Swiss-Prot record:
Cofactor comment text: Reduced FMN (FMNH(2)).
Biological classification of the source: Bacteria, Pseudomonadati, Pseudomonadota, Alphaproteobacteria, Hyphomicrobiales
Pfam families linked: Chorismate_synt (PF01264)
Protein name (record): Chorismate synthase
Metabolic or biological pathway, per its Swiss-Prot or TrEMBL entry: Metabolic intermediate biosynthesis; chorismate biosynthesis; chorismate from D-erythrose 4-phosphate and phosphoenolpyruvate: step 7/7
Superkingdom to which the source organism belongs: Bacteria
Species, as recorded: Rhodopseudomonas palustris (strain BisB18)
Binding site for FMN: 131-133, 243-244, 287, 302-306, 328
Cofactor(s) named in the record: FMNH2
């Protein structure tokens, strides 16, 4: 199975399966002399960790990260710092229940990657989905914590802005509220609504989709490159690679199709520190290059495919059958995608910073 690596200069390779011994990643291209400890990475992993509320999978994983290589104690400062060598990270799996999947080992779960993995490789890991499981995203979050260290002047934040058909009231947007509710929602009132709404979905054994918005503040003008190395191209690809994501937009995205040229234009005026934009429909990127405004992206997460309702499917022999999925699953996988989105955008920005320096210096 190829294509387990993303990035150009700041490269991340992930490995491991949902029900394997461990998962992990190797980060290659991280600059040297950056202070880095396991605690720096653990903070981000704890936000994504499963089993923290009734609204996420009840699989209990501590997600304790171990740094295996790429760091050492600096002889002068006494701080643990990166050396420029590949940084290997390991997270042990401790709460697998493979027996929950024994009844479906010969059946394809609708909406999952079971059929396509089987069609391509002739084999699939039916125990929790293997590499296609959201469990893999813990390694991305770990890599993202390192990426944040590479771009310390940039703040990458994400929030859940829609669940099912219900959107937040953007007039109530409060970043401080994101950490105060189990949905990472910036609208306090809507977060309360989501509790009852998702409880109903969960008790019915079903699931629901969501929309996540990610914003990067502090990205300077000039990152990215024309045509085939666009900043928004890489952000879109990174977000699209997250499990269960089915759509990505930058800035106003698909809504711009309903606007006129006058409405969509991000007009400019002279400011004390250079040109100032009067709006940000473009999401902080024009021609594939950052404008200095906040970089904004959104993505849609489909409903979790593993639900308790019986569904029609076929088995490996091509016979019609029904399937009932057991196991522990997120009623809204979009909740835990918030921290994953931040990590992926942070990795893209770290990659583009290094590429930018390589092209123009500084």
């Amino acid at each position: 199975m190829s294509f387990n690596t993303f990035g150009h200069m700041f490269r991340v390779t992930t490995f491991g399966e949902s029900h394997g011994v461990a998962i992990g990643c190797v980060v290659d291209g991280c600059p040297p002399l950056i202070a880095l400890t396991e605690a720096d990475i653990q903070r981000d992993l704890d936000r994504r960790r499963p089993g923290q509320s009734r609204f996420t999978t009840q699989r209990q994983e501590a997600d304790q990260v171990k740094i295996l290589s790429g760091v050492m104690v600096h002889p002068q400062s006494g701080l643990q710092v990166t050396t420029g060598a590949p940084i290997a990270l390991l997270i042990e799996n401790t709460d697998q229940r493979s027996k929950d999947y024994s009844e479906i080992k010969d059946k394809f779960r609708p909406g999952h990657a079971d059929f396509t993995y089987e069609a391509k490789y002739g084999i699939r890991d039916y125990r929790g989905g293997g590499r296609s499981s959201a469990r893999e995203t813990a390694t991305r979050v770990a890599a993202g914590a390192i990426a944040r260290k590479v771009v310390p002047g940039i703040t990458v934040r994400a929030a859940l802005v829609q669940m099912g058909p219900h959107q937040i009231d953007r007039d109530n947007w409060d970043w401080e509220e994101v950490g105060n509710n189990p949905f990472f929602c910036p609208d306090k009132d809507k977060a309360k609504f989501f509790e009852d709404y998702l409880d109903g979905i969960r008790k019915n054994g079903s699931s629901i989709g969501a929309v996540i918005e990610v914003v990067a503040d502090g990205v300077p003008a000039g990152w990215g490159a024309p045509i085939y190395a666009k900043l928004d191209t890489d952000i879109a690809a990174a977000l699209m690679s997250i499990n269960a994501v089915k759509g990505v937009e930058i800035g106003d995205g698909f809504a711009t199709a309903a606007l006129t040229g006058e409405q969509n234009a991000d007009e400019m005026r002279a400011g004390n520190d250079g040109p100032s934009f009067l709006s940000n429909h473009a999401g902080g990127i024009l021609g594939g290059i950052s404008t200095g405004q906040p970089v904004v992206a959104r993505f849609a997460v489909k409903p979790t495919s593993s639900i308790l309702a019986p569904r029609k499917t076929v088995d490996r022999d091509g016979h019609d059958t029904d399937i009932l999925t057991k196991g522990r699953h997120d009623p809204c996988v979009g909740i835990r995608a918030v921290s994953v989105a931040e990590a992926m955008v942070a990795c893209v920005l770290a990659d583009h910073l290094i590429r930018h320096r390589g092209q123009i210096g500084g």
